[in-house]
């Protein structure tokens, strides 16, 4: 997973240089039967109701990840900056350029009401 996390850091850096900062960029590993990762993203320049936002993220993922790595991820979840989930993740930990924080799923499972085995927070940065 470490190699994939490094690739996600590259993806984040590339997208931020072209579009602006992310508020939140996280990976949640769902429990069986899925055993796949959800990509949780929030940025002021992304719109959860516009297909073009999803296409932009998906294209960058496909550009950087191998086909096998890409199949580990089941969906992209774009959240509005004022969403309560974004506020929760921003308050959980600050994660800046090049860092990440791993979380066990227990606390997140209780908060979000679905089973999360593991989570990585790759960006959590409040706007000034």
Give, region by region, the residue ranges found by the protein language model.
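Short, flexible beta-strand-to-coil junctions
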Residues: 28-32, 44-45, 80, 125-127
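A short interface-forming secondary-structure element
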Residues: 40-53
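Short edge beta-strands and adjacent turn/loop segments
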Residues: 20-37
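Helical scaffold of the NTase/Pol beta-like nucleotidyltransferase catalytic core
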Residues: 1-19
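Short, non-transmembrane amphipathic alpha-helical segments
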Residues: 50-69
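Catalytic "initiation/cleavage/transfer" segments centered on a nucleophilic residue
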Residues: 70-128
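Short secondary-structure junctions
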Residues: 14-23, 66-70
